Amino acid sequence: MNKRQRKNYIGIGARLAILLFALSSSLLAQGKNPIILIPGLSGSELRNKTTNERIWFKAVKSKSEDLRLPILADVTKMHDDLIASDILREVKIGIFPGIDVYGGFIKAMETRGGYHEEKWESPSENGFEDSLYVFSYDWRLDNVENARLLVSRVEGLKRKFNKPDLKFDIVAHSMGGLISRYAAMYGDADLPAGNRKPQPTWAGARDFDKIVLLGTPNEGSALSLSSLLNGYAVGNLRIDLPFVQDSSKFMVFTIPAAYQLLPAPNTLRAYDDRLQPVSIDLYDPKVWTKYGWNVIDDKKFNSKFSSEEQKTATAYFEAALDRAKRLHEALAAAPGKSGGIDFYLVGADCGTAPDSVVVVRDGNSDKWKTLFSPKAFTRSDGSKVTAEELKKVLIGPGDGIVTRRSFEASTESEKAGVRSIVGSTSDKFICEEHNKLAANAKVQDYIIGILNGKGTSAKDSTEK
């Protein structure tokens, strides 16, 4: 190589180095995708839209409002005077210290993740990068309705910024994961009418890049059935006193989202008094009547609802079950596919969670009893079933609320013949309780790593 050629090569190399430096500087200057934090069931404050009185979370029952929705045959039109305001950042009762819910996660994203919180209605000039938006929503309502609201808000921001190609990352806790999955698969479309099968369009791929599902019950939860039968429990404790927030089964009956958290079709594990498997179709109203589950048959029902609501109750109940079934079918309609969106599952399985039910006919009353917890009982023939025997069939690995089986959608994935029906890039397990996942520092740091492009692709990574 002569001197002139060497000079040319040096010149080309220098220009290439300058170009690469400029390109890397440009990429660094672009900032990170904005992220959306979606809470789970009961994770948003609910206020009266006229008086601004906070109804949830509020330990002492309001004198003017409760959480029950008006009963209508059309589940998608069930609204009242309550609207979602902020996410639940912490819960404080009386003189006791506040309990972190999502406030710690937001702070971690700001201090360790390099994000800043923005408002949907009035984003700053740079609200399209390194930003965090909280998606508070009325968690009582139909999940499809809330998924469509999410897409509408995202599209609205993109128009405000005049950035049609802008994409958001999502961190969705618990039921929020079902909302984000539907938004990703179907965009702002409703469930198909009648008996038409859902066909995922992955319309959400134009809006979303990464979705982190944090403790999401992808196959539902037996606890939701328990809530519909016995009332809503907070921390496995059922409280229903006159001066405390109503959590009775009559309140839960009016909440469409409660039905949509039932175990997905053909995933419920049920056993008889011999602890042998029995087939139960949760989405057949006749089954609810057979086992004494239908709250409409309760003697107190008429005293809890108006005459108009009593007339509509059966139509509403059947519609709520049907829509819940169709939502689960829609979420399972693209097994193993992700539509170009990266899904990450982050959860816990170091504890236990209710995984099934046992149905027993009472020898004295001839009525059915439904067991969710391992409590010993005596069969009609006098033989006993111990708590330890029940524990083996009723309880599975999980985070106290969601089983690992539901979190990973294992039953549906196995039936579909795919590794993950959710199409997840990876599964990560960190030892924590369901309601404390977002507040866990290890979970926060792991999610920050995912958002920064450092998420592992190794299946079944576990940290105890």
Question: Residue ranges of each PLM-predicted region?
Answer:
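N-terminal non-catalytic accessory region
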Residues: 29-171, 175-263, 267-282, 388, ...
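N-terminal secretory signal peptides that target proteins for export/translocation
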Residues: 1-11
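C-terminal subdomain of alpha/beta-hydrolase-fold enzymes, centered on the catalytic histidine
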Residues: 299-464
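Intrinsic-disorder/low-complexity loop/linker signature
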Residues: 52, 126, 272-275, 291, ...
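Serine-hydrolase catalytic core
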Residues: 274-288, 296, 333-339, 345
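Bacterial N-terminal signal peptides
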Residues: 13-25
